[in-house]
Amino acid sequence: MESRVLSSGATTISGIPRLTRPAGRTTTTTVVAVASPAKLNTNGGNLVWGRQLRPSLLNLDHSSPVSLVTKPVKRDVLKPCTATASDSAGDAAPVGFFAKYPFLVTGFFFFMWYFLNVIFNILNKKIYNYFPYPYFVSAIHLAVGVVYCLGGWAVGLPKRAPMDSNLLKLLIPVAFCHALGHVTSNVSFAAVAVSFTHTIKSLEPFFNAAASQFILGQSIPITLWLSLAPVVIGVSMASLTELSFNWLGFISAMISNISFTYRSIYSKKAMTDMDSTNLYAYISIISLLFCIPPAIILEGPQLLKHGFSDAIAKVGMTKFISDLFWVGMFYHLYNQLAINTLERVAPLTHAVGNVLKRVFVIGFSIIVFGNKISTQTAIGTSIAIAGVAVYSLIKAKIEEEKRGLKSA
């Protein structure tokens, strides 16, 4: 930087008159460096502040005889630019608390993700204990979320992103798979213990790997396949001795795994620049349209005949409506926080967090509902969760290595 300033002032130095002493004395030349204004650069790296120039280049030693320059020299000094970053900490703009401690924000996201997920699963199962209509409840989950999204758009939080016909065509398969996976998950939740459903749903990585290998034609490393072996073994052990086992709950959870696998496949084809909040809002709206018809056809007559009246007789109108509203809010918010958390952390961190979330849900559901599980079921569940953890870590590491190669 100093070399640039000196070179830009070369023409000015040549114009300064020489002061010569009488004969017999040595000649001293006054060297005055005058900095012309440097070209501003928005990256802040090429800015030269006035206080940086003065000590080294612009100060004249007034105790020296050469300070007797009769012609005044005008010195141009750069003023600090408030719009760009400063070279010193003293000129930096004030940093907010959350910007200064981002790990606290990320920790809060994880906490709320876990908390809302656990509360959703517990409240959801309590509703099914007195209102066993999973198709209707699934539609309520999405309906409450849609109302929440529409309210957010109405006040500009967030601002609604535009939707065109091309994006709509891409999102319809994603929303259909999301709706099918959501409904079948709830059918399983209503039929068997929450802990058992989540144990079956831990097989989802196996279906993802199989779909990637045989449908998308992607090569899956042998290490990933080996890491899935404990998952399959653990789920098999847990299923054989699960006290609440029935085929409806088991098959529904398996269909949910397949549905969410295809949702991932279609999501990759529907990659868009739309932010995750708006994208999830549109998926929720379309998914709700898919969930309403089966709820009316399969459960409508029973609901009108005795479903609603039985639920109100058991818990009362206020609690019944309140439970449906809050379970829908918890469902939407925990899914939204899961997406927002993924945006804040690396895939490896999110993978670990997702595994721990399933452990929390299984553990809390056993404690809250007092589900009795056999020793073999407990061991099988632990093996399955451990296998999912290993798979998630290996997959996340592979993804990070791929991104590192692309950025290089």
From Swiss-Prot:
Keyword match Transmembrane helix: yes
Principal location: plastid
Residues that span the membrane, as ranges: 103-123, 136-156, 214-234, 279-298, 377-397
Compartments it resides in: Plastid, Chloroplast membrane
Topological domain ranges for the Lumenal compartment: 124-135, 235-278, 398-408
Residues annotated as transit peptide in the record: 1-82
Protein name: Triose phosphate/phosphate translocator, chloroplastic
Organism: Flaveria pringlei
